[in-house]
UniProtKB/Swiss-Prot annotation:
Annotated disulfide bonds: none
Quaternary structure annotation from Swiss-Prot or TrEMBL: Interacts with host transcription factor NAC069.
A GO cellular component entry from the record: extracellular region
Organism expressing this protein natively: Bremia lactucae (Lettuce downy mildew)
UniProt KW keywords: Host membrane, Membrane, Secreted, Signal, Transmembrane, Transmembrane helix
Gene (UniProt): BLN03
Top-level taxon of origin: Eukaryota
Name of the featured protein: Secreted RxLR effector protein BLN03
Function field: Secreted effector that inhibits stress-induced relocalization of the endoplasmic reticulum tail-anchored transcription factors to the nucleus, thus affecting stress responses.
Family note: Belongs to the RxLR effector family.
Entry's transmembrane regions: 149-169
Signal peptide coordinates: 1-21
Length: 169
């Protein structure tokens, strides 16, 4: 686990403890006697067992590494069957070796999807594949032609027309 998570957990537990301590009086007898004299019920300041269990579960989930693959295999068992197929494993290993999957644009797109919490649609999957293919190409001219294809062809056509116009005059 990264050291950053430890710092976050410590800071959150300190903040949680401080929030609990702010609402409680330092000397409980004064408030208790005032409440009894005014006829109000005294509210218990101790958290119940359910709250403690939820807090401990939350802290455990903070310290545990997140694994979304376990959720997928539990919900869709066909994924496990198809992943055990030789051709599927071979294709997946070939795809993971592509340099485009490790590009910064794809990482930014993935972090954007995680932040917004939106569902993956066919268009977003197509966009992620497009980014991976474009970024895995090694040729600069090929990358430019894919990215700026129509503008690139327009500029070259305009230059050719100007060249013919200059020679005709």
């Amino acid at each position: 686990m990264r050291p950053r998570k430890y710092i976050v957990v410590v800071l959150l537990s300190i903040a949680y403890t401080m929030c609990l301590a702010v609402g409680y009086p330092s000397d409980g007898t004064d408030d208790s006697t005032k409440s009894l004299k005014s006829g109000n019920r005294i509210r218990s300041h101790t958290p119940d067992i359910g709250t403690e269990e939820r807090t401990l579960t939350w802290l455990k989930s903070m310290l545990r590494p997140s694994s979304s693959s376990a959720k997928v295999t539990k919900e869709i068992p066909e994924v496990v069957k198809s992943a055990s197929d030789f051709k599927v494993r071979q294709t997946l290993s070939a795809i993971t070796r592509k340099l485009g999957l490790h590009s910064q644009r794809l990482k930014r797109f993935a972090s954007w999807l995680r932040k917004t919490g939106e569902r993956l649609t066919r268009k977003k999957v197509y966009y992620a594949g497009y980014i991976a293919i474009v970024d895995s190409s090694s040729s600069q001219l090929k990358r430019l032609s894919v990215t700026y294809g129509s503008a690139f062809l327009f500029v070259i056509g305009f230059i050719v027309l100007l060249a013919f116009a200059m020679t005709a005059v």
